Amino acid sequence: MPHKIGFVVVSSSGHEDGFSARELMIHAPTVSGWRSPKFCQFPQEIVLQMVERCRVRKLQLLAHQYMISSKVEFYISESLPEYLVPYQAERFRRLGYVSLCDNEKTGCKARELKSVYVDAVGQFLKLIFHQNHANKYNIYNQVALVAINIIGDPADLGDESNITSREKLIDHYLGHSPHNPEDPALDGTFSGRSDYISPLDDLAFDMYQDPEVAQIIRRLDERKREAVKKERYDHAKKLKQAIADLQKVGERLGRYEVEKRCAVEKEDYDLAKEKKQQMARYRAQVYEQLELHGLLQGEPEMQRPFALPLQPLASPSSPQHWKAVSSLPRTEKLVAEDSFAGPVLQEKPSASSPQHSAVDPSPPAAGHAPRSHTEVLPYDERPLPVTRKQLGEASAEAEVKEADSDVRRRGVAGEPEPLTEKALREASAAIDTLGEALVAGAYSKMWSCREDALLALYKKLMEMPVGTQKEDLKNMLRASVFLIRRAIKDIVASVFQASLKLLKMIITQYIPKHKLGKLDTTHCVERAFPLLLARAGDSSARLRVMALNFIQEMALFKEVKSLQLIPSYLVQPLKANASVHLAMSQVDLLARLLRDLGTESSGFTVDNVMKFAVSALEHRVYEVRETAVRIILDMYRQHPALTLEHLPPDDSATRRNLLYKAIFEGFAKIDGSVLPTEAEVRAQKRVATKEAEKQKKEEMKALQGQSGELRETQAGVQEKESEAVKLRNQDPQGRKAVLPDTPEIPANHFLDNLCIFCGERNESFTEEGLDLHYWKHCLMLTRCDHCRQVVEISSLTEHLLTECDRRDGFGKCPRCSEAIPKEELPGHIKTKECSPAKPEKVANHCPLCHENFAPGEEAWKVHLMGPAGCTMNLRKTHVLYKATAPQQGKGPAAAKSSTSAPKVGSKIPTPKGGLSKSSSRTYMRR
């Protein structure tokens, strides 16, 4: 049968001081394991030598919580390699590799326990550790291994195959199957199968158990198997129960040892002494109970001394390493998951001490049995010292009665300590009703006693006869609620769960059974619910989920639902100093119960739910805000009109808040309006741009046609006038006055020499001339002071917020809608001196003079180019000066320039479709 194989560390590529690879030879709750040197070269290597040549069946690795190797390779060899000779490395045969989790999901607070099933024969095992996973805790790029466990059996190759074949042949003829035991009671336990691996050989067992107690458990397990073989089932049952109790004892002693080591490291020697004495008393009490029931004495054929200490198997040339090392960071803790080390211990240490300590056990005491006797025994069979004297002959086995079994169970688990004076005063009413023994159990420092007290109280309340006096029933209920309140605050999950079970029984069974009133149910809920809600914000995810599920379940009890108490607690506004978990749990509970209970006679109303949800929209935690949005949408489905009363109006200013934008878009979906996707929006913009360009071209063609007709009409009129003048002014010599020809503009060159923004036409407006006009003179354009691009004044605000190179330095004022530098924005908003902007359909808002004026595109031309318009348009001064200059000139040159000066107020309108974004926003860069 495969079992635990002892080993020694032959070599390693290096280690950090105090974290030698020899630490891997010890399995205990306080071990620290091996760590590579800081900033080491990869790969790192460790070579182990097993106590004998064996067939390895299973390898277990307990990884560090943050010093994690990305990959670990396994090699096996029959003999020790000599690294000085290169070809000797070929002696190792590669078995494969495993990849380790980077532990990001647990925040580097859990240790991964990796089990690898192999089938290889050898005596030397080599582990190669590759590059570490990077995380914020592993600042030195190290890899570490807390523990390694090897499970296998001796490799007797000459007989193994024959024995295996013979066993299979016998099973075949007897109709047995190793995977389908004949006795269903043996399924999953030891049944004589050759491939069975005992749970006591698992690495998780040793890493949580006190070493002495773990060795005693192994002895009792051997005796249990012998008793089963001899069909002494009563004795086997007794041993099975003792093993179960001892596992709890071992976990407790292991935790005491960790707390003692932590106290020593903090130089709190009083606490260390107290823990040492506590361990000694508890250990002596347990051993006394075991001796009382004959559990420390083996059968005559199984008797073995308990006189040798647990120590690693080391060769004479490799001295023992007993060096204390510092504890792990306080943030580290073991988490029980499918792939992580477990189980979770029910009793947690005090808050002042870390949950782990990495210290080595003390060196073995001198004066024990000779070393030669140790080497005869297999590594995992070495006995531990229990008493200084040698045990006598085994006593005869006696039948154990049920009452005796109960006494033993209580003795092994430990009796509750007496109540202190403070506890006596605090729980005086409960003691008078329930008795001091039960209350002492509920106040005990041992979690098992606290749990047993609650279970005993549960049983006591269930057995209360129906005809009991009402006063006694109410006193019993109030005393029970008092203990429940204390247990709800317990940090141990099993005690907390027992309190929930007891509270549920009181509300759903005890009160209805004895026909107590609603006042008693109200008393239970009011006293327990605030504490339950606080536990819903616990840092432990396991306790948090238990509390959330129970609150939801309790709110649906028919006895509690009619009281409408729980909804009134949940709609209370979130406190600013509340924990993140509590805020998330409260909004999550409200969302759950709102779906289950609705708003009709449930304690939830549209008013109180919406007030809570709107206030939750301002919470600092994203998950809280997201759940609040979901609550508002749920309320809108049922009460749309009442829901809208608690929200701001749906306008562009409100939609600038992303949460309200999501809310109103959700309303639209609920109402049946189909909102376009982002792809659809982009497609619509492209279509709109094309339509605008097409419309612009059509308008230009229409304008060109109109101007052509006007020129033809004007030419006809001028021709008639010229004929009349010709007749009137004809001189005797037959000469006629020749009028200068009127210049005509071809239709296909109408846009030549024209500014499409201000409408000015000038012969100097060539391609370069227009660039100069845009850059310096056009009244509709301006230069951005930050990126020096030329933009339309009407779109200056949008440019500063979305297109400018310095756009990250601007914010939008919700009052005037202008782009304000972010460092000035808080003061700008606070003073409220800006001119409020109106909706685009009502008025335009000028970013230069900050005034509102008539809406529309033409209004921009009037405002920016007219004499009574914008007073802050600096280009207007230059144009006015340019227009008045010809009037001040003298002579024909001045008159000629006056007649040829371009008109500022051109009547050519700006195209209604507007320009494409590429041409209307940014025109040139210096």
UniProtKB/Swiss-Prot annotation:
Q: What is this protein called?
A: Centrosomal protein of 104 kDa
Determine if Cytoplasm is one of this entry's keywords.
yes
Keywords tagged on the record: Cell projection, Coiled coil, Cytoplasm, Cytoskeleton, Repeat
Function, as annotated, reads: Required for ciliogenesis and for structural integrity at the ciliary tip.
- SMART domains recorded: TOG
Q: What ranges does the record list as Polar residues composition bias?
A: 916-926
- List localization entries: Cell projection, Cilium; Cytoplasm, Cytoskeleton, Microtubule organizing center, Centrosome, Centriole; Cytoplasm, Cytoskeleton, Microtubule organizing center, Centrosome; Cytoplasm, Cytoskeleton, Spindle pole
| InterPro entries membership | ARM-like, ARM-type_fold, CEP104-like, CEP104_N, CEP104_Znf, Galactose-bd-like_sf, TOG, Znf_RING/FYVE/PHD
**Transmembrane segment boundaries:** none
Gene Ontology cellular component list: centriole; centrosome; cilium; cytoplasm; spindle pole
Which Gene3D superfamilies does the record match to this protein? Answer: Leucine-rich Repeat Variant (1.25.10.10), Zinc/RING finger domain, C3HC4 (zinc finger) (3.30.40.10)
What is said about its interaction partners and assembly?
A: Interacts with CCP110 and CEP97. Interacts with ARMC9, TOGARAM1, CCDC66 and CSPP1.
Which positions carry the signal peptide feature in this UniProt record?
none
Query: Where do the coiled-coil regions begin and end?
Result: 212-279, 678-730
UniProt source species:
Mus musculus (Mouse)
**Stretches with biased composition (Low complexity):** 889-903
Renumbered to this chain, region (Disordered) spans 345-419, 690-741, 885-926
Skewed-composition ranges (Basic and acidic residues)? 398-409, 690-701, 718-729
- HEAT repeats sit at 522-558, 603-639
Main location class? other
